[in-house]
């Protein structure tokens, strides 16, 4: 079998009718985890419904419908394989909770595929002030998705079809915009494709002889290719943050007869091992880890990305809960957050947001109301430069630097130190009204409770 391929996560973004579903569906269909029987079933249904031209988008619609109805569809359907990687599509917009998912994200995307439609008039609509192309690209940038691929789709419907001039125009315009928000266009492959007909998806297209291929310059060197598949293979795999101190936000806490209290969550940074002395924030409780398990097997160490359960001594199920964060008591332990400063982008709020506004924040697994205590500055969301001090209010489309105060104990971190614990979604009226990135955290130096087991191991407190 040889070496297992590396896994990477991508998020597919772009305006509503840019052809995201068709393009994604095409990749899954051609390289992916959908078995022949399922495809034949979908094709038959499509013919019966007179949607013969459906092909790929139909596949995705079926998957989406099942996902939204809460049917646990085989997640393999959202995976596909390239010569170099196993790729998982962690989400695609169009979902009600897309933005929230992308932020509290069960996983961080390694690369965003921005799909833009090149058809006459379509591109302009997508990148206009109220199109989603800009919003999604900005969101990807804000949330720390460092790499991007631009798929210039619907090349078959340019005027004339497969127009080199149109591809040039779209490339220039998109480059200018993404440069403003902080991406380097030189490091981004721009691929002219037809997600529907398959041009330049997996094989070079005969319809665009003028396209000599894409070329990108990155610190890893120059890479070239012709197709979208090759562009995906040019993604630089992520470095797992094992060298950072441990942060593990709890998803749940169970009480298991004969074993005791078992917190469950995903290691975001660092390493968790049996015998380690961990501190839970914001509760400030310290105790020893007896054992660590994943998929019912004991682990000697859990690494970033691993979903694990671990057994802790002398801590009751009432002491800790979802949203608590486990950390290494001897290496930058997590603490309760008194106040934090964040750069916030208001996305869709019907009115003005001013000091005193107290919506719910979703940050890692925590879900807690926080008060916008002070609007410190309004910034240009494209350049990040300050445009006004102490603004009275912020409205949709604005970005600002804000001080927030949690209404209940909470533990968050700065985005630069611990990215998964430093980005959040602001929820109100059942939608995501804003997203934010934490710049600075004021931590409380509370006196904690150290369990007997941990005292023996020589942590805090006087030995009795």
UniProtKB/Swiss-Prot annotation:
Annotated ranges, domain tr-type G: 5-242
Coiled-coil residues: none
Gene Ontology cellular component terms for the protein in this record: cytoplasm
Primary location recorded for the protein, binned into one broad class: cytoplasm
Keyword Magnesium found: no
Residues involved in GTP binding: 14-21, 91-95, 153-156
Database matches in Gene3D superfamilies: P-loop containing nucleotide triphosphate hydrolases, Translation factors
Location in the cell: Cytoplasm
Keywords carried by this UniProt record: Cytoplasm, Elongation factor, GTP-binding, Nucleotide-binding, Phosphoprotein, Protein biosynthesis
Molecular function terms from GO: GTP binding; GTPase activity; translation elongation factor activity
Positions where 5-glutamyl glycerylphosphorylethanolamine occurs in the chain: 301, 374
Function as written in the Swiss-Prot or TrEMBL entry: This protein promotes the GTP-dependent binding of aminoacyl-tRNA to the A-site of ribosomes during protein biosynthesis.
HAMAP family, sorted: EF_Tu_A
Family designation: Belongs to the TRAFAC class translation factor GTPase superfamily. Classic translation factor GTPase family. EF-Tu/EF-1A subfamily.
PANTHER family (UniProt xref): TRANSLATION FACTOR
Protein name listed in UniProt: Elongation factor 1-alpha
Organism: Onchocerca volvulus
């Amino acid at each position: 079998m040889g070496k297992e391929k590396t896994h990477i996560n991508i998020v597919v973004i772009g305006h509503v009718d840019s052809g995201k579903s068709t393009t994604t569906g095409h990749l899954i269909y051609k390289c992916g985890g959908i078995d022949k029987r399922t495809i034949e079933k979908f094709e038959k249904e499509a013919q019966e419904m007179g949607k013969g031209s459906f092909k790929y988008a139909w596949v995705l619609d079926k998957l989406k419908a099942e996902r939204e109805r809460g049917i646990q569809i085989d997640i393999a359907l959202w995976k596909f394989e390239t010569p170099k990687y196993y790729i998982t599509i962690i989400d695609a917009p169009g979902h009600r909770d897309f933005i929230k998912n992308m932020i509290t994200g069960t996983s961080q995307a390694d690369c965003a595929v921005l799909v833009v439609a090149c058809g006459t008039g379509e591109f302009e609509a997508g990148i206009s002030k109220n199109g989603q192309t800009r919003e999604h690209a900005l969101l990807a940038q804000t949330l720390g998705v460092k790499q991007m691929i631009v798929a210039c789709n619907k090349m078959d419907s340019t005027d004339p079809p497969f127009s080199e001039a149109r591809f040039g125009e779209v490339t220039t315009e998109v480059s200018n915009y993404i440069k403003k928000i902080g991406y380097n266009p030189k490091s981004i492959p721009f691929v002219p494709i037809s997600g529907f007909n398959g041009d330049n998806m997996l094989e070079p297209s005969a319809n665009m002889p003028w396209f000599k291929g894409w070329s990108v310059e990155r610190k890893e060197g120059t890479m070239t290719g012709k197709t979208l598949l090759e562009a995906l293979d040019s993604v630089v795999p992520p470095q797992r943050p094992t060298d950072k101190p441990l942060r593990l936000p709890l998803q749940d806490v169970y009480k298991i007869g004969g074993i005791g209290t078992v917190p469950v969550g995903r290691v975001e940074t660092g390493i968790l091992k049996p015998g380690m002395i961990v501190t839970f924030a914001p509760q400030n409780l310290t105790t020893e880890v007896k054992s660590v398990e994943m998929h019912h097997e004991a682990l000697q160490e859990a690494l970033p990305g691993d979903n694990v359960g671990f057994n802790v001594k002398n801590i009751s199920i009432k002491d800790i809960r979802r949203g608590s964060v486990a950390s290494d008591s001897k290496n930058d332990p997590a603490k309760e957050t008194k106040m934090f400063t964040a750069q916030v982008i208001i996305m869709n709020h019907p009115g003005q947001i001013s000091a005193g506004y107290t919506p719910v924040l979703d940050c890692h697994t925590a879900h807690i109301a926080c008060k916008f205590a002070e609007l410190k500055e309004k910034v240009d969301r494209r350049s990040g430069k300050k445009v006004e001090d102490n603004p009275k209010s912020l409205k949709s489309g604005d970005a600002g630097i804000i001080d927030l105060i949690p209404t209940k104990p909470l533990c968050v971190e700065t985005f630069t130190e611990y990215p998964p614990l430093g980005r959040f979604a602001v929820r109100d009226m059942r939608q995501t009204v804003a997203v934010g990135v934490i710049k600075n955290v004021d931590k409380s130096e509370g006196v904690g409770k150290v369990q007997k087991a941990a005292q023996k191991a020589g942590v805090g407190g006087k030995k009795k």
